[in-house]
Amino acid sequence: MNPKNLLKIIEEVRKFDDQMEAQAIAVFFYVGTYGYNDGVLMQQIQKDLSLGQSSVSRNVYKLADINRHKKKAIGFLYTFDDPMERRRKKVSLTSKGKRVFNSLKDLAS
């Protein structure tokens, strides 16, 4: 990816939250890339991005509709129980998240 395109992507994401950290952006792009339709397991995000469970949870909630303090958040992601194993959580894009992801994906190319 062209570094100029990467900077454009970061600028666009930060329009939603000017304090958004690189980890949160990485989680958003991971979910958009690997869990666009069916979602992705939180454990898989941990493993593939080499993040701890608390880091993944914190970043997912920053990007969700409601954060962990029960306040309105960005609204890019939502979590749900894995239908195959209810103890596991999956993460997917909201319709807003899909719109933003698609527009950012276009910037990357």
Listing of model-derived features with the role each one plays in the protein:
Residues 2-18:
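Short, Lys/Arg-enriched N-terminal segment that forms or immediately precedes the first helix
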Residues 11-12, 98-109:
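Amphipathic alpha-helical dimerization/coiled-coil segments
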Residues 14-52:
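N-terminal helix-turn-helix DNA-binding core of bacterial DNA-binding proteins
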Residues 18, 82-83:
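Short polar/acidic secondary-structure junctions
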Residues 60:
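DNA major-groove recognition helix of helix-turn-helix
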Residues 64-82:
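A short, conserved structural fragment
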Residues 83-101:
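Basic, amphipathic "hinge/linker" alpha-helix immediately C-terminal to the N-terminal HTH DNA-binding motif
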